[in-house]
Curated annotation (Swiss-Prot):
GO molecular function: protein-transporting ATPase activity
Keyword Transport assigned: yes
Subcellular location per the Swiss-Prot or TrEMBL entry: Cell membrane
GO biological process, one term: protein secretion
Protein name: Probable protein-export membrane protein SecG
Keyword annotations from UniProtKB, A to Z: Cell membrane, Membrane, Protein transport, Translocation, Transmembrane, Transmembrane helix, Transport
Record bears the keyword Cell cycle: no
Taxonomic classification: Bacteria, Bacillati, Mycoplasmatota, Mycoplasmoidales, Mycoplasmoidaceae
Family statement: Belongs to the SecG family.
InterPro entries from the UniProt entry: SecG
Species for this entry: Mycoplasma genitalium (strain ATCC 33530 / DSM 19775 / NCTC 10195 / G37) (Mycoplasmoides genitalium)
Length: 77
């Protein structure tokens, strides 16, 4: 396995764990769309504290995951 693949695998597992942690906090966060809950997309909600930090971390990890995926797919071998 290439080192970038290992890093991407670890990031994917971390994102999955964070998504599962966020799934209990409201119907707009985490993996709510996969669990079949009603999505309240247009309701005004404001997450605070630990939930907000987890959301920001997950967003950053997903963006880094996408960037690494693009770099890995276009890198010469």
């Amino acid at each position: 396995m290439h080192p970038i693949q290992i890093v991407m695998f670890i990031m994917a597992v971390i994102c999955l764990i964070i998504g599962l942690l966020l799934s209990n906090h409201g119907s707009t966060g985490g993996l709510a769309s996969l669990s079949g809950q009603d999505l309240e997309i247009f309701r005004k909600t404001k997450d605070r504290g630990f939930v907000k930090i987890l959301q920001i971390i997950m967003f950053i990890l997903v963006v880094l995951f996408l960037i690494l995926g693009l770099i890995f797919s276009f890198a010469p071998r």
